[in-house]
């Protein structure tokens, strides 16, 4: 466990709203360096301004988490600015409603891209950095958190694509 979060680095996807934004606020209060990631520039800009006003060191990036090249660049930027992150919150998520047989291939690709590949990219890119940091310093601690959903326990109607991912 991490005992003192001051000066530690957190990477938060979906940081422009919801859980991601709330976790960024908590991180700022705890004195963390924040890497804010969102696909919506206006939400990212607002979150960045709020965290900087709270005194946090912020690296903000507009990134489509489903895009491997964008995520690879994000990981390189994080490594260069802060080193290995102590916390990675793979939080970005989307859902397409409607009848599953009426959803388009684009709908499926969008939801699978963000909700599945976003997590895959976050884990595959940041885990090696974190393991290297822990090998260099046995006292170093880090955590990866992947957002889950109540939909894994209680299925909502007309959310077929989203629900197909929850039960993988």
Spans of model-derived segments:
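The beta1-alpha1 cofactor-binding region of Rossmann-like NAD(H)/NADP(H)-dependent oxidoreductases
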Residues: 41-42, 62-73, 105
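A short, exposed helix-loop element centered on a Lys and neighboring polar residues
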Residues: 123-124
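Active-site loop immediately N-terminal to the catalytic Tyr-X3-Lys motif
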Residues: 101, 154-160
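Residue(s) in the substrate-gating loop at a strand-loop-helix junction
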Residues: 149
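Conserved small/polar residues in nucleotide/adenosyl-binding loops
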Residues: 167-168
């Amino acid at each position: 466990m991490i005992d003192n979060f001051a000066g530690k680095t957190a990477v938060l996807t979906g940081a422009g709203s919801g859980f991601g934004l709330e976790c960024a606020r908590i991180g700022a209060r705890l004195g963390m360096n924040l890497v804010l990631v969102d696909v919506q520039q206006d939400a990212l800009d607002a979150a960045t301004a709020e965290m900087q006003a709270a005194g946090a060191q912020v690296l903000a990036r507009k990134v489509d988490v489903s895009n491997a090249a964008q995520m690879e660049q994000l990981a390189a930027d994080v490594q260069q600015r802060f080193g290995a992150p102590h916390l990675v919150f793979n939080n970005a998520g989307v859902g397409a409603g409607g009848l599953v047989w009426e959803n388009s291939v684009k709908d499926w690709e969008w939801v699978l891209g963000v909700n599945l590949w976003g997590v895959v990219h976050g884990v595959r890119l940041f885990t090696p950095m974190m393991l290297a940091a822990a090998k260099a310093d046995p006292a170093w601690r880090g955590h990866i958190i992947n957002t889950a959903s109540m939909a894994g326990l209680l299925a909502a109607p007309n959310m077929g694509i989203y629900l197909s991912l929850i039960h993988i």
